[in-house]
Amino acid sequence: MQSTPIILVAIVLLGAALVRAFDEKEALAKLMESAESCMPEVGATDADLQEMVKKQPASTYAGKCLRACVMKNIGILDANGKLDTEAGHEKAKQYTGNDPAKLKIALEIGDTCAAITVPDDHCEAAEAYGTCFRGEAKKHGLL
């Protein structure tokens, strides 16, 4: 599969995953490993996983919780359900290979999304961050 995982690692590596400057197969493998370990914990289905991989909004609460679990496992969602910008910046550096232009975009996306107001519910927060990541990635021509 040639899709960049995101968002997540939309989802989600604070936009760095959307920059495509890293080993997509390795990133997707890490995302899948994390997601598969989270699925039983949150009651997510294969359909929830496929939505995440395809960078689509979650259609179920379990799908939102799957994203929150993955983001926590990766280290970018903290115990309070907020983006950990310091960890996100480190992930951005790692996944952009420190390419200055790509790193700048990834950090901009991460900082923009970290500044949004999200619900206290961690699952809903993860979905809100994912929506932000997708929107910002589109603005930068990455999706």
Curated annotation (Swiss-Prot):
Transmembrane segments: none
Signal peptide: 1-21
UniProt entry tagged with the keyword Magnesium: no
Disulphide connectivity of cysteines: C38-C69, C65-C123, C113-C132
Keyword set, alphabetical order: Disulfide bond, Secreted, Signal
Coiled coil segments of this chain: none
Gene Ontology MF terms: odorant binding; pheromone binding
GO cellular component: extracellular region; extracellular space
Free-text tissue specificity from the UniProt record: Expressed in antenna, mostly on the medial and posterior surface of the third antennal segment.
Major subcellular site: secreted
Intracellular or extracellular location(s): Secreted
Keyword Disulfide bond: yes
GO BP: sensory perception of chemical stimulus; sensory perception of smell
CDD domains: PBP_GOBP
Stated name of the protein: General odorant-binding protein 28a
Organism, scientific name: Drosophila melanogaster
